[in-house]
Amino acid sequence: MSFVSIITPSHNSVQFISVTIQSVLDQSFSDWELIIVDDCSTDNSVEVIQSFVEQDSRIKLIRLSENSGAAVARNTAIEAAQGRYIAFLDSDDLWLPDKLEKQLAFMQANDYPFSYAAYDKIDENGQVFGHIGVPDRVCYSDLLKTCSIGCLTAIYDTQYFGKVSMPLIRKRQDLGLWLKLLKKTDYAYGLNQTLAQYRVRTDSISANKANAAKFTWRLYREVEGLNLIKASYYFSHYAVRGLLRTKAPGLARRLGVLK
């Protein structure tokens, strides 16, 4: 049984999946399993993944029978996971080599069941162009206002929570999971050290922003069950903070919206 189970959904990820897997293989902490769930890819990413599976028994590939979306893919991996800790890494993102070692030490030294970390933003060529710092801790209501937890950095302890799955929505399912966890504990704790790299794809930036807003509203209303007044209150925080981070990052930093 591995100590950490790494959850990676994959769909037509041939362009970046090799470097993503390699970033896991390069970890200084080695007691992990990487569970990749392929969501009916039509490129040759499955063949690429399989080549890694054949080289390292810690890497596992599960193939879905029909295209089902990232939430189903991640939940399938969570169900198959055997590790105490559940970590997340998407198929185009990267971990720095000491990510697991530092973050697990942070959690165990402080008895934290749920943690996250700072990360850099990279472009399609792997060049760093931005940085996302994190607050020391967040609670449920904090996260409704703005999601400070990057999926590629999140880790939770199944000894504390059990296995907790993502809500079955097409977008923002990661935020939905963090909210579920924060109903079971007071805080998630942030390690403000850069431990990962989030890849921003130029072909989907505008669409992602629009979809994120739409599905954030749906998450408030349909998953969290917030009434119209509460949902509007939290959505206004989400929208204003997002606008400040994008259009006025200097002001956002002074206000504590952008670390």
Q: Can you name each region flagged by the protein language model?
A:
Residues 2-4, 25-36, 44, 56-60:
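Short loop->beta transition adjacent to catalytic acidic/histidine clusters or analogous donor-positioning motifs
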Residues 15-18, 43-51, 94, 98:
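Acidic helix N-cap motif at the loop->helix transition within catalytic regions
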Residues 1-25, 257-258:
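N-proximal low-complexity "stem/linker" segments adjacent to membrane-targeting elements
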Residues 98-129:
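Conserved donor NDP-sugar-binding/catalytic core segment of glycosyltransferases
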Residues 86:
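Short aromatic/hydrophobic "clamp" motif used to bind/position activated sugar donors
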Residues 64-81, 102:
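Glycine-rich, basic loop-to-helix element that forms the pyrophosphate-binding segment
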Residues 30, 38-47, 66, 90:
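A conserved acidic beta->alpha catalytic loop
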Residues 79, 131-215, 219:
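Conserved nucleotide-sugar donor-binding catalytic segment
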